[in-house]
Amino acid sequence: MSSPFPADTPSSNRPSNSSPPPSSIGAGFGSSSGLDSQIGSRLHFPSSSQPHVSNSQTGPFVNDSTQFSSQRLQTDGSATNDMEGNEPARSFKSRALNHVKKVDDVTGEKVREAFEQFLEDFSVQSTDTGEVEKVYRAQIEFMKIYDLNTIYIDYQHLSMRENGALAMAISEQYYRFLPFLQKGLRRVVRKYAPELLNTSDSLKRSEGDEGQADEDEQQDDDMNGSSLPRDSGSSAAPGNGTSAMATRSITTSTSPEQTERVFQISFFNLPTVHRIRDIRSEKIGSLLSISGTVTRTSEVRPELYKASFTCDMCRAIVDNVEQSFKYTEPTFCPNPSCENRAFWTLNVTRSRFLDWQKVRIQENANEIPTGSMPRTLDVILRGDSVERAKPGDRCKFTGVEIVVPDVTQLGLPGVKPSSTLDTRGISKTTEGLNSGVTGLRSLGVRDLTYKISFLACHVISIGSNIGASSPDANSNNRETELQMAANLQANNVYQDNERDQEVFLNSLSSDEINELKEMVKDEHIYDKLVRSIAPAVFGHEAVKKGILLQMLGGVHKSTVEGIKLRGDINICVVGDPSTSKSQFLKYVVGFAPRSVYTSGKASSAAGLTAAVVRDEEGGDYTIEAGALMLADNGICCIDEFDKMDISDQVAIHEAMEQQTISIAKAGIHATLNARTSILAAANPVGGRYNRKLSLRGNLNMTAPIMSRFDLFFVILDDCNEKIDTELASHIVDLHMKRDEAIEPPFSAEQLRRYIKYARTFKPILTKEARSYLVEKYKELRKDDAQGFSRSSYRITVRQLESMIRLSEAIARANCVDEITPSFIAEAYDLLRQSIIRVDVDDVEMDEEFDNIESQSHAASGNNDDNDDGTGSGVITSEPPADIEEGQSEATARPGTSEKKKTTVTYDKYVSMMNMIVRKIAEVDREGAEELTAVDIVDWYLLQKENDLGSLAEYWEERRLAFKVIKRLVKDRILMEIHGTRHNLRDLENEENENNKTVYVIHPNCEVLDQLEPQDSS
């Protein structure tokens, strides 16, 4: 006898024009007037997420079982009478009472037909060829070539059809019509690209299903062959026979939906982008776009999309069980003779899985109200949308707002959050009398363990479109965005800030390209770009140059060993209060893409780099991005950098130089990218900059972190009548005229497009530029050879790399591919101005250094006697009378026994040191007799003869020269030798050894290494 059971699975037997059973998540929205009367007939999935739990609710398969039961009751009355006394028969009759007629969603079918017509007929005229192209049919061919699953639909294209009725219907009730849209897409694909429907494992799965069916049939024959009678009229075991036939029929059936490809529809270019704070329950189920910054991403996991279960009691297979955002089993077995409601086994081979990823986004920094905490929202990505958003990306998501159970609250111990009656005012004596039955206290209590999530169908980074036109500019740009999205999916790459010039130019309109060409041809483009940076800030041209070069950046390189050399430029602005330091930071945050603003005092090491946190639902450890990761390929602005703790400053050492963040916590060992530029603002110690202290003395920063900054700008609040007048006029005009008071050469949009285009260049050094770069580095290095002055800034190899990065950025500003010596000269001036501009202390020398002069006079006097009055002692024998009287009066006073200090400027001290060291080195190279202090001073005064206007200046300069020589000996630049080297070799001349003191270069002195090349040149 033929089996009365349907050959297909119950869920696949649904009529083609019927609406699929909505889940409990979407059952409360999207109801049109035609469906409001049928709300009571809707089917629900079980509310429990636990498998193997008995549930009394009706399931999606009750329609098929009741249809079969009614047919059996009408056609086989004898069998019904025999089953009346059995328990399965009573259950069988109870199912027949729940007969519910399926509802045809007429509106959904109309939407499907309109969507199919839209995919087939919509066309756009191409600007290149002038021909009319059918956009979405061409995209289906593109999907077939690259084996893709997602089709991208422009919402503006939908609004052009049927006076926007189709777009409005999809926007308002997106969750309701999504199954119909997917069905319409499958019909169009089956018509124009049928080979795209089958996946690579369709044939394998079909063969596996046939083998599984044969195995199950043989197993049923072995179990029931000996006990079941062959007579069809026998009623000895009707239940077993029915179970066997149902098993064979259901097991061998394979639904077409079970093997077809799962297509996804991605809508983009919606007219309105909502903020996370604007998400409300009234928008549940509607299509909308939201914007936010990605802070955390989970790993990509498989999600059970359409499940296939096997009944553990009768071995019946149930396919296409929709999962309502949780593990959902069938409510009961479709076999009417089987009483199974809890025991199911998942068939992994027959089930369909999709890629799944959860992304947590946070409100953008410019959208957070003052004094409010930033809101967060979980976004669910499926299919081809996974791995599109990275931590730190400012993305725009298009999808539907859904409500899901808050699993984290359900699993917590203790009292569950719920709405209860406030009984604090009721007397305790009457509480027991009026309480009634205690079991009714929870009647009608509503659980509060739900939260709002966002199911996204499209995601795109907002930062990658900087410089492109607005979404509703013209259809050509929207088509370019659609093609870029398709290419992005095909290549499986994510566009960064250094994409190819051709791709960037294709995203611009013809007017924008012509405007960009005019800017490139301008001879004074560099100066105009500088004046366009922060136009509201008066002056500070050097700081504006540094910020412009920071946004342009250098070229990222990597060595043969794989070591990466950073191209980002780090800048620190130091200065007095009210010198526009924070205003520069605020401008960069609002102008540059992927920029993050933070304060050093309120930031920790984990908040700046990354933190390891535990996932609330899965319990796994995940990495939550910090400020540096959020600013990847951008700029991280850190205000009050000097207020940051030293331990927190150490945490960003690696990020500033290697541009990576290494984490070894909670079993996670990872190296994350932090390719960001740092723009820091710091106040000096004590509030105002102290000119008598060094740069390091004015800052609460360590030497390693100072060397990682490419540029230091010291802004001082000096009193200047002209500058103060211009500054006051600028501020007053800014308050009076607002934007009219500012006239930058280029607007913000023009500047963004130019910087975006300039970053596509990768300039290289020429041979002339290489030689010039080496010479300029030697000039920077020579003043800091030994670090003899505590006020000097240590010039290291990092400053050489800074000059290279600055030169590359200047070349990018001019849109050229080669670095010329003029670019290096500009970088050298900027680096020297930013670092060497710091005022240094005067060099102090004690009065005890005068003793060297008297000793030198005595030694020179003895030499004059031996040399018959020839030598330099003649000049120093008789000082002027007024100077001698002054010295005698000073020695007669009792208070003059204390040491007096003479100060000389640092520049003059360095100049005198260079002259003296060069002279002694020259004498040493020629092999002449060593010089005494008097010889050195006389030679120095001879060189300074034209600069001395009076005799008093002569004696003052002479006394200062002796003190400088003594200071050079103390600093171990010179070394005293008692007696000449020739006399030292002669051990018999012991008298001359004590009578003459000469000076030579100290063996450990490194100043000479910097001076000799200059002499040779």
Swiss-Prot record:
Residues 1-94, 200-257, 852-901 are annotated as: Disordered. It catalyses: ATP + H2O = ADP + phosphate + H(+). One of its GO terms (cellular component) is nuclear pre-replicative complex. One of its GO terms (molecular function) is ATP binding. The modification Phosphoserine is found at S78, S249, S372. The keyword Hydrolase applies. One of its GO terms (biological process) is DNA strand elongation involved in DNA replication. A motif (Arginine finger) lies at residues 707-710. It is found in: Nucleus. Its EC number is 3.6.4.12. InterPro entries: MCM, MCM6, Mcm6_C, MCM_CS, MCM_dom, MCM_lid, MCM_N, MCM_OB. Its main location: nucleus. CDD domains: MCM6 (cd17757). The keyword DNA-binding applies. ATP binds at G575, D576, P577, S578, T579, S580, K581, S582. It is an enzyme of class 3 (hydrolase). Residues 209-223 have a biased composition (Acidic residues). Transmembrane segments: none annotated. Component of the MCM2-7 complex. The complex forms a toroidal hexameric ring with the proposed subunit order MCM2-MCM6-MCM4-MCM7-MCM3-MCM5; loaded onto DNA, forms a head-head double hexamer. Interacts with MCM10. Belongs to the MCM family. Acts as a component of the MCM2-7 complex (MCM complex) which is the putative replicative helicase essential for 'once per cell cycle' DNA replication initiation and elongation in eukaryotic cells. The active ATPase sites in the MCM2-7 ring are formed through the interaction surfaces of two neighboring subunits such that a critical structure of a conserved arginine finger motif is provided in trans relative to the ATP-binding site of the Walker A box of the adjacent subunit. The six ATPase active sites, however, are likely to contribute differentially to the complex helicase activity. Present with 13400 molecules/cell in log phase SD medium. This is DNA replication licensing factor MCM6. It comes from Saccharomyces cerevisiae (strain ATCC 204508 / S288c) (Baker's yeast). The lineage of its organism: Eukaryota, Fungi, Dikarya, Ascomycota, Saccharomycotina.
